[in-house]
A protein has these predicted regions:
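Structured helix-beta-strand junction loops
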Residues: 65-66, 160, 226, 298
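A conserved active-site cap/scaffold subdomain adjacent to cofactor or substrate pockets
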Residues: 134-209
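Short, ordered loop/turn segments at secondary-structure junctions
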Residues: 40-43, 74-75, 110-121, 169-172, ...
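Nucleotide/pyrophosphate-binding catalytic subdomain
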Residues: 1-149, 154, 317-319, 338
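A conserved regulatory-domain signal marking ACT and ACT-like small-molecule sensing domains
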Residues: 175-340
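Short glycine/serine/threonine/alanine-rich loop segments
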Residues: 33, 103-104, 162, 228, ...
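Alpha-helical scaffold segments in soluble metabolic enzymes
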Residues: 11-14, 23-30, 96-100, 137-140, ...
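Short hydrophobic alpha-helical runs that function as membrane-insertion/retention elements
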Residues: 105-109, 164-166, 231-232
Length: 340
């Protein structure tokens, strides 16, 4: 059963994408658009090339100035796009298309705007659309499970210097958010308050850790073996805490291995949430103070705190019951007050 499932997923994805692209082409032609169906699904191809070769071969001879290519989101390739990228495969194809064709800009249509906060939680009248940000911030959002585009897709476009515009399909008059490589807000500000509540803290406490080279390396070896990526991390003299998604596969297996390997350590877990304050230009004294003060005034205890020297993301680890209150408090202090 496990042997044929990957191939079946690839086949089903290719059929669905080909059907959608073909119908879209016919609809556009009926409306006077010179649309051209470009089928990358490869269902008739005997040979399998790399994705770049597949795209280049199928686009060869097309004059983009006189026609509109309607391309399948699925592209047959040696590496198996569904197996490698799962449900984000269409954004990988999108990215490769942009790079191969030397696009001026890539536009992704979502069902939402990239906003300063969750409008359903904070209120549509209190949030604003983020007009411009950079790829660094897009990475931070992906870690919060809020990816505007698949991280592996954005990397290819970032390296090629191609900006991405995230537009709301239900608000066509709004230019949306432009994500470019080097943008930094002209004045210090917070761009977004966001977070995730599906976080598990894995704490390793061991008095023998003090001054012991490679201790953390051995902890991470188990994470790597079980393909578990961490979102945030705290350390002190005798404690290392990694914050991971509780939905991570092999989590129980990883915890069992840690307990077997570190006999003298106390290994514990705790369900937590992370709320992030993100911005391209926050290198100003006072942002952290204001954020911590806003949480304290809302009676929220900060369990842990992370911020790298580059100062684009402050992560507050809190109890899950405070998740929504924390976002409202931080948005009110760091975004809404700045707009007054």
């Amino acid at each position: 059963r496990e042997d044929y499932l990957p191939a079946a997923r690839e086949l089903l994805s290719s059929i669905g994408e080909a059907h959608s692209a073909f119908n879209s082409t016919l609809i556009l032609r009926e409306r006077g658009v010179n649309a051209v169906f470009v089928d990358l699904s490869g269902w008739r191809d005997q040979d399998t090339d790399s994705m770049e070769e597949t795209i280049s071969g199928h686009l060869a001879g097309l004059d983009f100035a006189s026609c509109m290519p309607i391309v399948t989101g699925y592209a047959k390739c040696k590496e198996g796009v569904m197996a490698k990228f799962d449900r984000g495969y269409s954004e990988i194809t999108f990215s490769k298309l942009a790079v191969v064709t030397g696009a001026r800009e890539g536009i992704i249509h979502k069902e939402f705007h990239l906003s300063t906060g969750d409008p359903k939680l904070i209120g549509a009248d209190k949030v604003r659309t983020i007009g411009h940000t950079n790829y660094d911030i897009a990475d931070q959002l992906a870690d919060m499970a809020m990816e505007a585009i698949h991280p592996k897709a954005s990397k290819a476009m970032e390296l090629a210097g191609i900006p991405i515009r995230v537009a709301n399909a239900f608000d066509p008059g709004n230019p949306g958010t432009l994500i470019s490589r080097d943008y930094v807000a002209p004045t210090p500000r917070v761009d977004m308050i966001c977070g995730r509540r599906d976080v598990l803290a894995i704490e390793v406490f061991d008095p023998e850790m003090v001054g012991e080279p490679g201790y953390d390396y051995n902890v991470l070896a188990s994470f790597a073996k079980n393909k578990i990526s961490y979102i945030a991390k705290n350390t002190n003299a005798n404690t290392i805490t990694h914050f991971v998604s509780e939905k991570s596969k092999n989590l129980d297996k990883c915890l069992k291995e840690l307990k077997e390997h570190f006999h003298g350590a106390q290994i514990s877990t705790r369900e937590v949430a992370i709320v992030s304050v993100i911005g391209t230009n926050m290198k100003l004294p006072g942002f952290l103070h204001r954020a911590a003060k806003a949480l304290a005034e809302s009676k929220i205890n900060v369990l842990a705190l992370d911020q790298c020297i580059r100062q684009v993301n402050m992560q507050f680890i809190i109890d899950r019951e405070d998740f929504e209150t924390a976002q409202k408090a931080l948005h009110r202090e760091l975004v809404e007050h700045e707009q007054i």
